[in-house]
Curated annotation (Swiss-Prot):
Glycans are attached at N135. Residues 40-269 form the Peptidase S1 domain. Residues 1-35 form the signal peptide. Pfam families: Trypsin. SUPFAM superfamilies: Trypsin-like serine proteases. Serine protease that cleaves preferentially after Arg residues. Can also cleave after citrulline (deimidated arginine) and methylarginine residues. Disulfide bonds join C65-C81, C163-C230, C194-C208, C220-C245. The gene is Prss57. It comes from Mus musculus. The keyword Hydrolase applies. This is Serine protease 57.
Protein backbone atom coordinates (compact mmCIF):
# COMPACT_ATOMS: atom_id res chain seq x y z
CA UNK A 1 0.00 0.00 0.00
CA UNK A 2 1.52 3.36 -0.96
CA UNK A 3 2.10 5.85 1.83
CA UNK A 4 4.02 8.99 2.67
CA UNK A 5 6.06 9.65 5.75
CA UNK A 6 7.69 12.55 7.53
CA UNK A 7 10.44 12.35 10.11
CA UNK A 8 9.75 13.62 13.62
CA UNK A 9 12.07 13.75 16.62
CA UNK A 10 12.34 10.49 18.53
CA UNK A 11 12.46 10.17 22.29
CA UNK A 12 16.17 9.42 22.48
CA UNK A 13 17.62 11.85 20.00
CA UNK A 14 16.87 9.63 17.02
CA UNK A 15 14.13 9.99 14.44
CA UNK A 16 10.89 8.13 14.08
CA UNK A 17 8.58 7.92 11.10
CA UNK A 18 5.23 9.65 11.27
CA UNK A 19 2.70 8.28 8.79
CA UNK A 20 0.95 11.07 6.90
CA UNK A 21 -2.58 10.82 5.59
CA UNK A 22 -2.28 11.41 1.84
CA UNK A 23 -4.41 10.42 -1.10
CA UNK A 24 -2.01 7.70 -2.07
CA UNK A 25 -2.03 6.17 1.41
CA UNK A 26 -5.60 4.94 1.66
CA UNK A 27 -7.23 4.92 -1.72
CA UNK A 28 -6.10 1.38 -2.56
CA UNK A 29 -8.31 0.26 0.34
CA UNK A 30 -11.33 2.11 -0.97
CA UNK A 31 -13.35 -1.06 -1.49
CA UNK A 32 -12.47 -2.73 1.80
CA UNK A 33 -15.18 -2.45 4.49
CA UNK A 34 -14.18 -0.67 7.66
CA UNK A 35 -11.06 0.98 6.25
CA UNK A 36 -9.87 4.31 7.54
CA UNK A 37 -11.96 7.17 6.14
CA UNK A 38 -10.92 9.46 3.33
CA UNK A 39 -13.29 12.36 3.11
CA UNK A 40 -13.89 16.09 3.37
CA UNK A 41 -14.46 16.39 7.12
CA UNK A 42 -17.36 18.53 8.33
CA UNK A 43 -18.28 19.70 4.86
CA UNK A 44 -21.31 19.82 2.59
CA UNK A 45 -22.21 18.97 -0.98
CA UNK A 46 -21.82 21.92 -3.32
CA UNK A 47 -24.28 23.03 -5.98
CA UNK A 48 -23.55 20.84 -9.02
CA UNK A 49 -20.85 22.29 -11.27
CA UNK A 50 -20.38 25.38 -9.10
CA UNK A 51 -16.67 24.51 -8.83
CA UNK A 52 -16.04 23.98 -12.56
CA UNK A 53 -12.26 24.00 -12.20
CA UNK A 54 -12.21 20.73 -10.23
CA UNK A 55 -10.59 17.65 -11.75
CA UNK A 56 -10.71 14.02 -10.68
CA UNK A 57 -7.65 11.84 -11.28
CA UNK A 58 -8.61 8.17 -11.48
CA UNK A 59 -6.87 4.83 -11.83
CA UNK A 60 -8.60 1.57 -12.77
CA UNK A 61 -11.95 3.33 -12.74
CA UNK A 62 -11.66 4.67 -9.18
CA UNK A 63 -11.13 8.25 -8.04
CA UNK A 64 -7.62 8.56 -6.60
CA UNK A 65 -6.69 12.24 -6.27
CA UNK A 66 -8.02 15.68 -7.01
CA UNK A 67 -6.67 18.47 -9.16
CA UNK A 68 -7.68 21.73 -10.80
CA UNK A 69 -7.65 23.11 -14.33
CA UNK A 70 -5.40 26.13 -15.03
CA UNK A 71 -5.05 25.85 -18.81
CA UNK A 72 -7.01 24.05 -21.51
CA UNK A 73 -4.27 21.39 -21.60
CA UNK A 74 -3.00 21.42 -18.02
CA UNK A 75 -4.20 20.31 -14.59
CA UNK A 76 -2.36 20.91 -11.31
CA UNK A 77 -2.26 18.04 -8.79
CA UNK A 78 -0.01 16.69 -6.02
CA UNK A 79 3.29 14.98 -6.82
CA UNK A 80 2.79 12.33 -4.13
CA UNK A 81 -0.24 11.02 -6.03
CA UNK A 82 2.16 9.62 -8.63
CA UNK A 83 4.98 8.37 -6.41
CA UNK A 84 4.11 4.76 -7.20
CA UNK A 85 1.56 5.13 -9.98
CA UNK A 86 2.21 5.24 -13.71
CA UNK A 87 0.56 8.50 -14.86
CA UNK A 88 0.02 7.08 -18.35
CA UNK A 89 -2.47 4.63 -16.81
CA UNK A 90 -4.53 7.41 -15.24
CA UNK A 91 -7.46 9.45 -16.46
CA UNK A 92 -8.49 13.03 -15.73
CA UNK A 93 -12.20 13.82 -15.55
CA UNK A 94 -13.40 17.42 -15.86
CA UNK A 95 -16.93 18.78 -15.59
CA UNK A 96 -18.01 16.24 -12.98
CA UNK A 97 -20.19 16.52 -9.90
CA UNK A 98 -21.27 12.95 -9.12
CA UNK A 99 -18.42 10.71 -10.24
CA UNK A 100 -20.48 7.53 -10.03
CA UNK A 101 -23.17 8.80 -12.38
CA UNK A 102 -22.86 9.54 -16.11
CA UNK A 103 -23.07 13.27 -16.77
CA UNK A 104 -23.17 14.94 -20.20
CA UNK A 105 -20.90 17.68 -18.84
CA UNK A 106 -18.00 15.32 -18.16
CA UNK A 107 -14.86 15.42 -20.29
CA UNK A 108 -12.35 12.59 -19.89
CA UNK A 109 -8.70 12.72 -20.90
CA UNK A 110 -5.71 10.46 -20.63
CA UNK A 111 -2.51 11.90 -19.17
CA UNK A 112 -0.04 12.72 -21.94
CA UNK A 113 2.67 13.81 -19.50
CA UNK A 114 3.14 14.28 -15.76
CA UNK A 115 5.76 16.76 -14.59
CA UNK A 116 6.51 16.62 -10.87
CA UNK A 117 8.55 19.41 -9.33
CA UNK A 118 12.23 18.44 -9.62
CA UNK A 119 12.77 19.09 -5.90
CA UNK A 120 9.82 17.05 -4.63
CA UNK A 121 10.82 15.19 -1.46
CA UNK A 122 8.51 12.23 -0.69
CA UNK A 123 9.81 11.89 2.87
CA UNK A 124 8.77 15.41 3.88
CA UNK A 125 6.25 16.28 1.13
CA UNK A 126 8.32 19.36 0.27
CA UNK A 127 7.52 20.81 -3.19
CA UNK A 128 4.51 18.49 -3.49
CA UNK A 129 3.18 19.67 -6.83
CA UNK A 130 2.73 18.06 -10.24
CA UNK A 131 1.48 19.26 -13.62
CA UNK A 132 -0.61 16.92 -15.77
CA UNK A 133 -0.75 17.55 -19.50
CA UNK A 134 -3.99 16.34 -21.02
CA UNK A 135 -4.03 14.42 -24.29
CA UNK A 136 -6.47 16.94 -25.71
CA UNK A 137 -7.90 20.37 -25.16
CA UNK A 138 -10.59 20.95 -22.55
CA UNK A 139 -13.70 22.59 -23.93
CA UNK A 140 -14.54 25.46 -21.62
CA UNK A 141 -18.15 26.10 -20.66
CA UNK A 142 -20.42 26.40 -17.63
CA UNK A 143 -19.19 23.09 -16.13
CA UNK A 144 -15.52 23.37 -17.11
CA UNK A 145 -13.59 26.53 -16.30
CA UNK A 146 -10.09 27.57 -15.32
CA UNK A 147 -9.00 28.47 -11.80
CA UNK A 148 -6.76 31.48 -11.37
CA UNK A 149 -3.41 31.20 -9.63
CA UNK A 150 -2.06 33.77 -7.19
CA UNK A 151 0.58 36.21 -8.36
CA UNK A 152 4.06 34.71 -8.39
CA UNK A 153 5.70 34.80 -4.97
CA UNK A 154 2.64 36.53 -3.50
CA UNK A 155 2.37 36.45 0.27
CA UNK A 156 -0.04 33.78 1.54
CA UNK A 157 -3.44 34.87 2.85
CA UNK A 158 -3.30 36.28 6.35
CA UNK A 159 -3.99 34.06 9.35
CA UNK A 160 -7.73 33.80 9.92
CA UNK A 161 -8.64 34.22 6.24
CA UNK A 162 -11.62 32.05 5.30
CA UNK A 163 -10.97 29.67 2.41
CA UNK A 164 -12.59 26.58 0.92
CA UNK A 165 -11.26 23.14 0.01
CA UNK A 166 -13.17 20.63 -2.14
CA UNK A 167 -12.91 16.96 -3.00
CA UNK A 168 -14.56 13.61 -3.74
CA UNK A 169 -13.22 11.60 -0.81
CA UNK A 170 -15.50 9.20 1.08
CA UNK A 171 -18.02 10.62 3.54
CA UNK A 172 -17.75 7.82 6.10
CA UNK A 173 -15.21 5.31 7.39
CA UNK A 174 -17.10 2.54 5.56
CA UNK A 175 -16.36 3.27 1.89
CA UNK A 176 -19.48 5.37 1.34
CA UNK A 177 -18.80 7.65 -1.63
CA UNK A 178 -20.18 11.18 -1.53
CA UNK A 179 -23.29 12.00 -3.55
CA UNK A 180 -21.25 14.67 -5.32
CA UNK A 181 -18.41 17.10 -4.87
CA UNK A 182 -17.96 18.08 -1.23
CA UNK A 183 -16.54 21.29 0.23
CA UNK A 184 -15.63 22.68 3.64
CA UNK A 185 -14.74 26.15 4.88
CA UNK A 186 -11.45 26.43 6.75
CA UNK A 187 -9.23 29.24 8.02
CA UNK A 188 -5.60 30.01 7.33
CA UNK A 189 -3.33 29.18 10.28
CA UNK A 190 -0.10 31.05 10.94
CA UNK A 191 2.73 28.89 9.58
CA UNK A 192 4.89 29.20 12.69
CA UNK A 193 2.01 28.01 14.87
CA UNK A 194 1.34 25.15 12.46
CA UNK A 195 5.01 24.24 12.29
CA UNK A 196 5.18 23.79 16.05
CA UNK A 197 2.36 21.24 15.77
CA UNK A 198 4.35 19.41 13.10
CA UNK A 199 7.60 19.25 15.08
CA UNK A 200 9.29 21.87 12.89
CA UNK A 201 9.03 19.78 9.70
CA UNK A 202 7.31 22.41 7.54
CA UNK A 203 8.97 24.88 5.18
CA UNK A 204 8.05 28.38 3.92
CA UNK A 205 6.56 26.95 0.70
CA UNK A 206 3.77 25.28 2.69
CA UNK A 207 0.45 26.61 3.97
CA UNK A 208 -1.79 25.44 6.82
CA UNK A 209 -5.47 25.62 7.71
CA UNK A 210 -7.64 24.73 10.69
CA UNK A 211 -11.33 24.78 11.51
CA UNK A 212 -11.23 27.96 13.56
CA UNK A 213 -13.15 26.26 16.37
CA UNK A 214 -13.28 22.88 18.12
CA UNK A 215 -15.04 21.12 15.27
CA UNK A 216 -13.19 18.72 13.00
CA UNK A 217 -13.13 20.29 9.57
CA UNK A 218 -10.71 19.81 6.73
CA UNK A 219 -9.55 17.42 4.05
CA UNK A 220 -8.50 13.78 4.10
CA UNK A 221 -7.17 11.10 1.75
CA UNK A 222 -8.37 11.14 -1.87
CA UNK A 223 -8.66 14.93 -1.64
CA UNK A 224 -4.93 15.33 -2.31
CA UNK A 225 -4.09 17.59 -5.23
CA UNK A 226 -7.27 19.63 -4.91
CA UNK A 227 -7.17 23.41 -4.47
CA UNK A 228 -7.49 25.57 -1.39
CA UNK A 229 -9.40 28.52 -2.81
CA UNK A 230 -9.12 31.92 -1.15
CA UNK A 231 -10.60 34.93 -2.91
CA UNK A 232 -11.20 32.98 -6.14
CA UNK A 233 -7.55 31.95 -6.49
CA UNK A 234 -5.81 28.64 -5.77
CA UNK A 235 -3.52 29.62 -2.91
CA UNK A 236 -2.99 26.06 -1.68
CA UNK A 237 -2.81 22.50 -3.00
CA UNK A 238 -3.87 19.66 -0.68
CA UNK A 239 -0.75 17.80 0.49
CA UNK A 240 -1.07 16.02 3.86
CA UNK A 241 -2.81 15.91 7.22
CA UNK A 242 -2.44 13.99 10.47
CA UNK A 243 -3.56 10.51 11.39
CA UNK A 244 -7.04 11.85 12.23
CA UNK A 245 -8.42 14.06 9.50
CA UNK A 246 -9.47 17.53 10.62
CA UNK A 247 -7.69 17.11 13.96
CA UNK A 248 -6.61 20.57 15.23
CA UNK A 249 -3.59 18.94 16.90
CA UNK A 250 -2.14 18.28 13.44
CA UNK A 251 -3.40 21.04 11.12
CA UNK A 252 -3.93 20.37 7.43
CA UNK A 253 -0.91 21.19 5.27
CA UNK A 254 -0.90 22.42 1.67
CA UNK A 255 1.66 23.28 -0.95
CA UNK A 256 1.74 27.08 -1.16
CA UNK A 257 0.96 27.64 -4.84
CA UNK A 258 2.38 31.17 -5.12
CA UNK A 259 5.88 29.78 -4.54
CA UNK A 260 5.56 27.68 -7.71
CA UNK A 261 3.77 29.99 -10.15
CA UNK A 262 6.96 30.78 -12.10
CA UNK A 263 7.78 27.06 -12.38
CA UNK A 264 4.22 26.23 -13.44
CA UNK A 265 4.16 28.63 -16.36
CA UNK A 266 7.74 27.79 -17.36
CA UNK A 267 6.66 24.15 -17.75
CA UNK A 268 3.52 25.09 -19.67
CA UNK A 269 5.42 27.37 -22.05
CA UNK A 270 8.18 24.81 -22.60
CA UNK A 271 5.78 22.11 -23.75
CA UNK A 272 3.72 22.20 -26.90
CA UNK A 273 0.00 21.56 -26.51
CA UNK A 274 -0.79 18.07 -27.88
CA UNK A 275 -3.75 17.77 -30.19
CA UNK A 276 -4.53 21.47 -30.09
CA UNK A 277 -6.32 22.79 -33.14
CA UNK A 278 -6.89 26.31 -31.86
CA UNK A 279 -5.73 28.90 -29.39
CA UNK A 280 -4.80 27.59 -25.95
CA UNK A 281 -6.33 29.39 -22.98
CA UNK A 282 -4.82 29.82 -19.54
CA UNK A 283 -6.06 31.40 -16.33
CA UNK A 284 -4.45 34.73 -15.50
Amino acid sequence: MPSSTAMVPGTRGGWHCLVLTTAAALTQLMWLPGCCGSYIVGGHEVTPHSRPYMASVSFEGHHYCGGFLIHTHWVVSAAHCFSDRDPSMGLVVLGAHALLAPEPTQQTFSIAAAVSHPDFQPATQANDICLLRLNGSAVLGPAVRLLRLPRRNAKPPAAGTRCHVSGWGFVSDFEEPPPGLMEVEVRILDLSVCNSSWQGQLNPAMLCTHSGDRRRRGFCSADSGGPLVCGRRAHGLVSFSGLWCGDPKTPDVYTQVSAFVTWIWDVVRASSSPGSTGRSVRAV
